[in-house]
Amino acid sequence: MTTLNTNDKDLPIVKKYDSLNGTWDFLKTGVSQIFERLDEGMTITKYMELYTAIHNYCADASKTITVDNFNDQTANVLGEALYNNLVLYLEEYLARLRKECISQTNHEEQLAAYAKYWTRFTTSARFINHLFGYLNRYWVKLKNRFTETLVYDIYTLCLVSWHHHVFSHIRDSLLQNLLYMFTKKRLYEPTDMKYVEVCVDSITSLSFDKTDMTKPNLSSYKTFFETNFIENTKNFYAKESSEYLASHSITDYLKKAEIRLAEEEELVRLYLHESTLKPLLEATEDVLIAQHEEVLHNDFARMLDQNCSEDIIRMYRLMSRTPNGLQPLRQTFEEFVKRSGFAAVAKIVPQVGGEADVDPKEYMEMLLSTYKASKELVNTAFHGDTDFTKSLDTAFRELVNRNVVCQRSSSRSPELLAKYADSILRKSNKNVDIDDVEDCLSSIIIIFRYVEDKDVFQNFYTKLLAKRLVNGTSNSQDAESSMLSKLKEVCGFEYTSKLQRMFQDISLSQEITEAFWQLPQSRAGNIDFSALVLGTSFWPLSPNNVNFHLPEELVPLYEGFQNYYYSCHNGRKLSWLFHLSKGEIKARINPQTNVTYVFQVSTYQMGVLLLYNHRDSYTYEELAKITGLSTDFLTGILNIFLKAKVLLLGDNDKLGDPNSTYKINENFRMKKIRVQLNLPIRSEQKQESLETHKTIEEDRKLLLQSAIVRIMKARRTLKHVVLVKETIDQIKSRFTPKVSDIKQCIDMLIEKEYLERQGRDEYIYLA
């Protein structure tokens, strides 16, 4: 049957009844047909006759009533009698429906009966509401406007009547039946749920504001149904979860919990009001997850150790649903990163030599693999969670700065990182393809960000860069520039300013050399020559204490360049770094083969070999006297020559003895024409490392003192504790200072009269 729109001015002619009883008797047949025999249908003519009868009754009565004389008495004339007769009919009709519902003792049958009658009743109520539309528009509206008596529109009247005569009598059994059906559903028992949605919708529809139907009001639904439903849910899952955990693994339980939560969401979508979703899930999550958090958390470490990725992802998803579920996971993850990282680093420490002989490449690759695996876990399993990222940062900073390699010295990580960077940026690197250099540099910066003693890295990196530039062994200018840019991005311009100046010196040196080659004195001895003029303020290089005597073959070139430079730069002084200089010597020493070899040597080595143009044999004492080399340097050089069989040690002689003899090997043979003899001497490397660490300590003291002076100059007076804290805050981007070192620097500044102690724990700045 279709709802019709009527026009009050175009109604059919219908017999007018002189009395209320006559009108109601006619209307009642139609009302009862709509409520009780709706499936039989009703003709449009019949429907319009009923509508017209209501209109005529109200219209005739309203002829003597105006807005000015409308009151409770006149309202009765206008339409209240019809309204009251409808109320009585609904009471009688709904009493019969109530008996039908109560007579059903089976859970599903009662729900089916209730759902059937409710659906039929609400459909009929909509037609009745339209049928009494004139009464709604005039009498109900005026009644509510001009009297204190609340009158419902016809549809609301039907709902209120249902609530009073049906629902309020069977609500308890209806609730229990609904809860029973939901429990069966959760137990996966065969359940016909088609009536459940209708019954719940009935409860929702009956939860209205009787004073204003336009206002949303779910108070009855919430207090009567939702509260009991959620409590029933909690009881169900409390029992099930405890029993399931007792007989299944944590992995199985997590899967079960996810399935159950998804099922509860589906229950709401299919059968309940959408507002129930949030409190239902919160209650279910509390029972399934929060109340078992400790047991679940205890298994998380195992999942991480065994790399159970699916379990880890599922654990994170579930724990993220509870208020404090993720905090223990973050702590466990942090400990896992440290524990696994420490164990991985320990495996690469050589049994002989210990942490002192750790290979930089192997060490850095181990740290990187640990970081990348952990970062991948954060991105995939923890969805890039910022708190888990912080836990990773905390753990990895601990790993980088306090692993077994760093036990003796916290500066080992930055030192090894600088050496690894050097291996990537040097031409001799054979392990990294040129296309992968940029990726390697980015990986270095990843580790660098976690290094606490960035000043240590700076010192070692600067020294190694100096070697690459001096020896011409940089892999590429682009790679060097890229590395500087990355360091500047992390630490700022000041950190890389000296490094930038070193590259400028190399460019200027090329210009100086090219200009020198235009002069006649540059061709002295017909020797190819180039010089690097390096500023002492920027380069970590200094003359050694060796009184080296330059070979006579090189003296004219040496003097010619020095005179040229002084003529261009008056007032400057050149300090020659012969220990860093190198060259090539053509040698034809085997008369049988007559092969010309090219020896790549240091200037010190050159000073020794060129002597053999004059004699075939020298004693150790003679070599030392002629070259001016110290015992350590000369012994190291001769050892290299003896191993390469360029020189031969006299019979029964011992290396380093004053009278031991060293003869040129006229039978020297080598497959390669170019022979690299300029090899690092281990004692030099060890001494260099010690000197670097010494320089770092001295630089730190100066840095601390300058920071303290800056702070005190700005603050004038400070307590000891505050000064220490502010000093640490200023310096921590470069390294983590010890409190004892800060105190020592304060004492030094007091001695220098920059500061004065006032009382026991306060300092005054002295201008």
From Swiss-Prot:
It holds the Pfam family Cullin. It is found in: Cytoplasm. Pathway: Protein modification; protein ubiquitination. GO terms for biological process: cell division; protein ubiquitination; SCF-dependent proteasomal ubiquitin-dependent protein catabolic process. Changing residue 713 to R: Loss of neddylation; results in impaired cell proliferation and marked stabilization of the cyclin-dependent kinase inhibitor rum1. Keywords: Cell cycle, Cell division, Cytoplasm, Isopeptide bond, Ubl conjugation. There is a cross-link at residue 713 (Glycyl lysine isopeptide (Lys-Gly) (interchain with G-Cter in NEDD8)). Disulfide bonds: none annotated. Residues 699-760 form the Cullin neddylation domain. Neddylated; enhancing the ubiquitin-ligase activity. It comes from the Eukaryota. GO terms for cellular component: cytosol; nuclear SCF ubiquitin ligase complex; SCF ubiquitin ligase complex. GO terms for molecular function: inositol hexakisphosphate binding; protein-macromolecule adaptor activity; ubiquitin protein ligase binding. Its main location: cytoplasm. Core component of multiple cullin-RING-based SCF (SKP1-CUL1-F-box protein) E3 ubiquitin-protein ligase complexes, which mediate the ubiquitination of target proteins. The functional specificity of the SCF complex depends on the F-box protein as substrate recognition component. SCF(pop1-pop2) is required for the maintenance of ploidy and directs ubiquitination of cig2. Component of multiple Cul1-RING E3 ubiquitin-protein ligase complexes commonly known as SCF (SKP1-CUL1-F-box) complexes, consisting of cul1, skp1, pip1 and a variable F-box domain-containing protein as substrate-specific subunit. Binds to the pop1 homodimer, the pop2 homodimer and the pop1/pop2 heterodimer forming the SCF(pop1-pop2) complex. Interacts with pof3, pof14 and skp1. Belongs to the cullin family. PANTHER family: CULLIN. This is Cullin-1. It comes from Schizosaccharomyces pombe (strain 972 / ATCC 24843). The lineage of its organism: Eukaryota, Fungi, Dikarya, Ascomycota, Taphrinomycotina. The gene is cul1.
